[in-house]
């Protein structure tokens, strides 16, 4: 720690935190602008530098016991310059996961170790332009701007609700007049007038109620469409790391939670809230009739609320358990359907069925517990309602007998009380839905609150030439995961064909993911034509990079649509030319529908080799300046591979080509071969040059394949 003042760890921390939030940062520029005296970034200059990157930063003082309530990662600032990044807090285990800026590695600290390092100063960081900022966080407050946006429609709904409540107030008064005046004085003419008036009120009440439901459903449907569109756009904008760290079933289950929110918005819950808001009008009239009976109704309302509050935490836990089990089932189902060929080939259907039965039984049991608890909650509400009814009947009868209240007034009072209690009971009975929606919002927030790939402020540069430079690259997938690439320095010239080989797990594919800007390195820069990819628009880059993987996915469309996926308006001639280069034209021509043949889900209607050749054509059709083959020919038969290799000269012409291969014969004609081992470049040269070194790793791998 004594050497901390010699190195500017604040600058390094800013670089890491900016990259975490997908914000471009140039360390040299930051140092030039804010480290004017060359002593490193002080606290004030660090905050200014962060704000210049459009980061939302706030310095706070927090005791250790409050750290599990803050948004992480955050920078722990120390006076001696030995800052570190706090990434995770486990209060149960009293452990803290930090990123040690000095060691450039994650560390797990015990409580005593952390207390020795923590000085109480911490800097909270969020991206202003991304959904990680507090103002953009998806929770119940997200609906407030949506309501404001459609405020005109909601005001119309409120106006209609006012008239509905007035009509609901008139009806009990008519009944009171009939009971106390018409029946006593046998006033048939008055009865006829009241009947006609009541009929008019009923007709208008039905019309207004239907109109309110229509207006409300229309507005909530628009909010639903807006949320659904936002969700899908955000999902596609998430970085690759989000999907690689989660099961497909989990993501699908979270997206499906939108259905719960939709049902809640279009249900009776919100209209019940509106009805409840106008209850003060009824209370005023009820108080006029009988303060004693009104107090009984008033005192019952806290009972409804208390019972619901008592039930809700237990219900929420059980709903959470139900969701988790449903997500497990969803993941297992997706996995089983995806791996159906393996399951059938290995005859493990009974094992999979047993696992499914156990998981399904757990889900059904969790759902049964939710139903039982919800039933208990509803019966408790019914008990309160019946008890209040009995008390009102007894007390109301006493008031009528004593002459303090007429029979008509008692009937009118009970009708008015029903107008108040009915929405309360409805709200209490749908409390389960509200708890479910709360969980749905939280689960959906896992998607919508995850930072997307940053496009704001990125550079859309001119057409690239193909020069690629890796400069001092250090990379790991997660802060607590092993280093995948370590001190990579590599220059690839425009038009050069590079082969990358090595054992599995040596970092070959990771290197190409950095070229596509799927990830930003922990340290160092990836440059194309001298431009730092951290500052470049990902879409601009990926449109000019063609990639063919070992396992490519085709969409359930025609062959021509799959090949021209990135540019649907492309001419048929260009599609056919790309297919010929990929060796796919001949087999496509033999199909009954030719290029209009639907390939099926994930290309299920084609063989593995055919799918691979279409994927190669898809990568070539846009004439990319950089072409990456990641084990692209390993799934091809020898005849198809021969066609590809025969056309390789045409494929590589005018492009920078990177070929990753375990089959060394694929790269022996490359301009240069890069050999990787444990995340480092250990050898490079031409095929014959590498074989001339008998002790080299390349020679060893080549000898194994020759044998």
Swiss-Prot record:
UniProt record similarity statement: Belongs to the ABC transporter superfamily. Protein-1 exporter (TC 3.A.1.109) family.
Domain ABC transporter: 468-703
Misc note: The complex HlyBD-TolC (OMF) forms a single transport channel across the two membranes, allowing direct export of alpha-hemolysin. These channel is involved in type 1 secretion system.
Organism expressing this protein natively: Escherichia coli
Underlying gene: hlyB
Subunit structure as annotated in this protein's UniProt entry: Homodimer.
SMART domains: AAA (SM00382)
Major site of localization recorded for this protein: membrane
Name of the featured protein: Alpha-hemolysin translocation ATP-binding protein HlyB
Domain of life (superkingdom): Bacteria
Functional description taken from the UniProt entry: Part of the ABC transporter complex HlyBD involved in hemolysin export. Transmembrane domains (TMD) form a pore in the inner membrane and the ATP-binding domain (NBD) is responsible for energy generation.
Peptidase C39 domain sequence ranges: 3-125
Boundaries of every ABC transmembrane type-1 domain copy: 154-436
Keyword tags: ATP-binding, Cell inner membrane, Cell membrane, Hydrolase, Membrane, Nucleotide-binding, Transmembrane, Transmembrane helix, Transport
MF terms (GO), sorted A to Z: ABC-type transporter activity; ATP binding; ATP hydrolysis activity; ATPase-coupled lipid transmembrane transporter activity; peptidase activity
Listed transmembrane segments: 158-178, 191-211, 269-289, 295-315, 388-408
GO CC terms of this entry: plasma membrane; type I protein secretion system complex
Pfam families found in the cross-reference section: ABC_membrane, ABC_tran, Peptidase_C39
Membrane topology according to the record: Multi-pass membrane protein
Residue sites binding ATP per the record: 502-509
Residues at the active site: 83
Subcellular location: Cell inner membrane
